């Protein structure tokens, strides 16, 4: 087991945590190159958000620690709830109701294989 090399965060992503978690399940425990390929061919909107965070983590690892890309793997992908925007939606007979637009957070931790 390697040590924690790098952590990248995506805060306030315009997708719900449950939708982000569907895509995050695809890349947990995979090598970085395999995870990037999975995200490239995934058609979900959340895959684009997670792909950006993963690329940021890889860039941080290469810039700060001079790590080879082939030795990196995705150890953890943490998905959490961020803020919710509340909007008003007009309804029948002069009434109104609230619409909640949920946002999510993603934290990706990369480890190095020994």
Swiss-Prot record:
GO biological process, one term: translation
GO molecular function, one term: rRNA binding
Keyword annotations: Ribonucleoprotein, Ribosomal protein, RNA-binding, rRNA-binding
Classification via Pfam families: Ribosomal_L22
GO cellular component, one term: cytosolic large ribosomal subunit
Function: This protein binds specifically to 23S rRNA; its binding is stimulated by other ribosomal proteins, e.g. L4, L17, and L20. It is important during the early stages of 50S assembly. It makes multiple contacts with different domains of the 23S rRNA in the assembled 50S subunit and ribosome. The globular domain of the protein is located near the polypeptide exit tunnel on the outside of the subunit, while an extended beta-hairpin is found that lines the wall of the exit tunnel in the center of the 70S ribosome.
Subunit structure and binding partners: Part of the 50S ribosomal subunit.
Similarity section: Belongs to the universal ribosomal protein uL22 family.
Name the UniProt record assigns to this protein: Large ribosomal subunit protein uL22
Gene name for this UniProt entry: rplV
């Amino acid at each position: 087991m390697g040590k924690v090399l790098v952590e990248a965060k995506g805060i306030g992503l315009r997708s719900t945590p449950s939708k982000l978690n569907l895509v995050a399940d695809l890349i947990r425990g995979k090598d970085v190159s395999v995870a990037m390929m999975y995200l490239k061919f995934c058609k979900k909107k959340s895959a684009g958000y997670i792909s950006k965070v993963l690329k940021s983590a890889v860039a941080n690892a290469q810039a700060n620690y001079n790590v080879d890309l082939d030795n990196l793997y995705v150890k953890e992908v943490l998905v959490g709830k961020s803020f919710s925007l509340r909007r008003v939606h007009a309804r029948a007979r002069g009434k109104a109701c609230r619409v909640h637009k949920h946002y999510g957070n993603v934290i990706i931790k990369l480890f190095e294989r020994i």
